[in-house]
């Protein structure tokens, strides 16, 4: 009895004094990490970027398979060249990317966001940038909340085909169709690529939602600067891959015709990075299909481009 009694307080004290203990035991060891980089560059202590995988797919209402998205993107990332042809640098090696083991997603939407929040909170507290990979769009709220708590002026740049502004869907507050509504409870949002929404989606009166529909900017080259101007200094970037044209990301649960081209989407993201501080981002709704690697590879490539933009523009400002 004495031995058991003496051990319990020690465990409790250790957990309280080391809040990053939960992240430490999740770190992937060895070379099977995101981008297959040198393990020395993939430790939690060394890396500036931290990958959180959440293959949650409990509220899917059309095409399935998003639960397999994180693993497919992870595998595809190991085929991505690390040299950035635009900047002539290897930002991924310069700053390091830590990969965490996939989260247990056998739960409901509220619980998975609680789990993501607990991990992302420790990542953000350590001065690192969380990269959340879904899974369906339901998962974004937990990471946004973690960033919002550290950066109270946070706003969200939301690339998507769908506005996701329903207050609830199929009786659920946490659903892939309510992702932006939950985020809007915390901060204002700028949406781009939208081409599917409800007639009435009010949003929060004190936290506006600025919508850039796909049809409005198809012939315009100036909308990106206007969109970025509506963002606050600190920004969370959430990307549903169906915000891009299906020719770029064909394997997704609810594809819509039209959308951002590859370079139009990258241009918007780069402009945001140039004048704002990206403190976290996610890529969601990849639903791999057998016989094609196009979508998951494009998603891995997109993540590498965002890392390059954040490294080149945001980290150079020493703003995190």
Predicted regions and their residues:
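Polybasic, lysine-enriched low-complexity intrinsically disordered terminal tails
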Residues: 1-14
């Amino acid at each position: 009895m004495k031995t058991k009694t003496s051990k319990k307080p020690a465990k409790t004290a250790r957990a309280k004094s080391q809040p990053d203990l939960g992240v430490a035991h999740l770190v992937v060891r060895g070379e099977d990490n995101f981008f297959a980089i040198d393990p020395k560059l993939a430790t939690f202590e060394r890396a500036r970027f931290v990958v959180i995988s959440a293959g949650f797919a409990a509220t899917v209402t059309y095409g399935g398979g998003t639960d397999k998205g994180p693993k497919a993107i992870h595998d595809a990332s190991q085929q991505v060249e690390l040299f950035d042809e635009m900047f002539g640098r290897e930002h991924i090696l310069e700053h390091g990317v830590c990969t965490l083991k996939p989260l247990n997603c056998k739960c409901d939407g509220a619980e998975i966001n609680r789990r993501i929040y607990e991990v992302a909170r420790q990542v953000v507290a350590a001065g690192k940038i969380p990269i959340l990979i879904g899974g369906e769009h339901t998962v974004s709220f937990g990471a946004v909340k973690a960033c919002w708590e550290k950066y109270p002026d946070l706003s969200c740049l939301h690339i998507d085909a769908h506005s996701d502004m329903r207050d609830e869907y199929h009786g659920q507050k946490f659903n892939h169709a309510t992702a932006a509504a939950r985020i809007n409870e915390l901060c204002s949002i700028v949406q781009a690529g939208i081409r599917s929404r409800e007639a009435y989606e009010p949003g929060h009166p004190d936290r506006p939602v600025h919508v850039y529909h796909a049809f409005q900017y198809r012939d315009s080259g100036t909308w990106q600067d206007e969109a970025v101007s509506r963002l606050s200094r600190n920004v969370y970037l959430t990307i549903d891959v169906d915000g891009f044209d299906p020719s770029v990301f064909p394997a997704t649960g609810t594809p819509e015709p039209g959308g951002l081209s590859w370079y139009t989407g990258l241009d918007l993201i780069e402009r945001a990075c140039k004048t704002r501080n990206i403190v976290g981002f996610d890529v969601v709704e990849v639903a791999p299909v057998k016989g094609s690697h196009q979508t998951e590879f494009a998603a891995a490539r997109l993540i590498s481009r965002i890392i390059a933009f954040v490294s080149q523009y945001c980290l150079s400002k020493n703003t995190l």
